[in-house]
């Protein structure tokens, strides 16, 4: 295995030699300032630009680590490899102005060769189909193509078969493969979470980056690990650049480290009112009868908000149903206009003292009980917000009646200031966001809350957030990571005192009075999905250019490129599924990675080799001092060994 690693290492050094003249900074022509790239940004850019035959790369970098700026740097300097390029950038439509257009306009003077395609817009995809032939015919000795795909997991998920049926996006996916692998073209994909749902997405991602080299099946996973891991890894060497300061997933606490805020997870288990529980049970029966029952649609709606006489859709057509929703929202708006809780009641509510205080206004108590009857979630969200010392983000994917529209009335009742970042606020949301992120609002004194839907779940940065509330669960951990990543980004808390550099993540899990919960069901789905996804993530994390370079930093570079052309044409060997039993004496230990001391892990140590195992797979190796003794720290009376990655 390591013979191939060393050859790739020689190619990396070849690229570094070839690009040593490239600057490590990029000039912002609008502000007339220079931005110095981080070492990892500069390194990945030079490898991608410096190796002609490395036609594809995945930037598997955490949220907030500068993927967009790195892509713009590559666009600016790829002419060092060849003078004439067509740049095709695939993005979500909502990310066009910020960050993409703003960043490109700041650093690149001539943008005439850059074309944007929105992969979440039918008309934009039609445009791509129309220009596909002209792009294909223009690729010759005079022109080359660079394809950049932002948040590539969004594009890949649209290409995976659903119920064994081909998706509408599949023909475009095939065209991208053809264009990307045309001689001398390049493709750069970017994502903090490149796989979101299943192994099929991983195969399609690899199919885009290195077509036909592999096809992993779920039966290749044994006890949470890939069999023949090393052989599979060889087909992926150098396929990605990997950057993560904190390895923990979205559901794990982390400490403050290297500019990233501390993260603490809180679960709020709350009980619906009898009326909300009754409607929830109706919704459950409705979901089971419909084709979309697997999406748990009605239960999710009712778990958020259940107006007292709002019944399940039944036989209403869409027009009738939407008209009913408008009427109910108008009724609820009219009802809440007269609610303005007193300061005494709000203080009692914050401190969970409503039942013990005897001097509260009866009107406040009655109004509170009615609001709780409609939504235990919104009530709990208001309590969390009122107890937060600083700014709060609230994720609510539902924009209409059972979501943001009704939630805002609760905020009005409790005198909570807010802005909304959703598909309904396109004209004003960027200005509102700038005001919310303004230095004078670092503690939320002017605007306390930003409510955001999926429109703000990726590519948007929030500053100085202390609490984030998840009102409705996404379907996978990758989306959850993106959502939480809006609040924890590199240096996002630098203007707060050190003791305020934290984010509390609140999951509100609502239960009916007979202990049923769609929130808990989806949370369990997230955990089950992530187990398989972590298997292929481990594969990517074992093969990036950084690990190979660290192993062979001082090896002589090659004279000419050869290896990536060979790897792209070498298909993975058939899997050997036979069981091989090796007996090792292992000892349970607690450890952390040297580059991520915030995440504490459990493992099994082989004292003879200093290798740490997770089940039967080596995952780390002890760091030792000059006397060959393990390096460790003691925190809270726990001995924690310091390690590096095994690969």
Curated annotation (Swiss-Prot):
ATP binds at residues 61-68. DNA-dependent ATPase required for providing the needed energy to achieve the termination of early transcripts. Acts in concert with the RAP94 subunit of the virion RNA polymerase and the capping enzyme/VTF to catalyze release of UUUUUNU-containing nascent RNA from the elongation complex. NPH-I must bind ssDNA in order to exhibit ATPase activity. GO terms for biological process: DNA-templated transcription. PANTHER family: SNF2/RAD54 HELICASE FAMILY (PTHR10799). GO terms for cellular component: virion component. Residues 48-212 form the Helicase ATP-binding domain. Residues 378-541 form the Helicase C-terminal domain. It catalyses: a ribonucleoside 5'-triphosphate + H2O = a ribonucleoside 5'-diphosphate + phosphate + H(+). This is Nucleoside triphosphatase I. It holds the Pfam family NPHI_C. InterPro entries: Helicase_ATP-bd, Helicase_C-like, NPHI_C, P-loop_NTPase, SNF2_N. A motif (DEXH box) lies at residues 150-153. Its EC number is 3.6.1.15. Keywords: ATP-binding, DNA-binding, Hydrolase, Nucleotide-binding, Transcription, Virion. Monomer. Interacts (via C-terminus) with RAP94 (via N-terminus). Interacts with the cap-specific mRNA (nucleoside-2'-O-)-methyltransferase. GO terms for molecular function: ATP binding; DNA binding; ribonucleoside triphosphate phosphatase activity.
